[in-house]
């Protein structure tokens, strides 16, 4: 046990393994059949719409991240002389925002792939459809925790090895910028995606059902595509960033509590090891439960 606590590189390795697992699952989902040409066309339209929204949203968010990151860097620099703050607070914020955005992007990509493949597989058997659906969910879940573990552990080890004169409190204070960055992206992704989702949903209902008398989700209603794009934007990309923010925030909060109660490096690192143990066991269960051979 003492060896494990002293070798923090195990945490980095677990994050890398989680992302390798994500890649394997993503490739497996991609290799499943999309069905006939009409199904592929509709799926491509939904995917193009979802990715276009994500591109526009992330483009606007990049300006926000740069401005706030620069402001935090400046404020951290001003506080170096009088507190445990540091100009690298802005760097932690930037890394957290990037990881949060990646979590949403990974979820969006695999969701738009898994949707049509699950539908096609359901024509053959419920088991095949569930296998694809669960694999798509595993990509999202393991992507969130893998990025969170890599980001948090990587930053902590970087600060610990580079700034050896820092106290434990200063490392944790600078590390909180990572959670702030993740929360900022989650806020805009969740709210922005939710607004688009509801606008598309209400618009499709009003125009289709009320004005034209077309049933909801009917193929003749062109707004159905926008409605499905909205479902992916709000319930996948927004949810992914939101989960990432909650995951990271819970770990950092536990690390701060460990420092406040025990002022010990072991108490600070314990939440990371617990998170590592939980998600690696879940990944092992998922790997055993799905036949990767299709």
List each language-model region with its residue ranges.
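Mid-bilayer segments of alpha-helical transmembrane spans in multi-pass integral membrane proteins
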Residues: 97-105, 141, 145, 149, ...
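Conserved small/polar residues in nucleotide/adenosyl-binding loops
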Residues: 46, 279-286
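Helix-coil boundary and interhelical linker segments in multi-pass alpha-helical membrane proteins
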Residues: 78-85, 157-170, 256-270
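Loop-to-transmembrane-helix entry motif
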Residues: 49-61, 125, 129, 133-141, ...
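Juxtamembrane helix-loop transition segments at the membrane interface in multi-pass membrane proteins
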Residues: 26-43, 105-127, 189-223, 288
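Hydrophobic, small-residue-rich alpha-helical packing segments that form membrane-like cores
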Residues: 169-181
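Transmembrane alpha-helix boundary signature
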Residues: 73-82, 106-113, 149-161
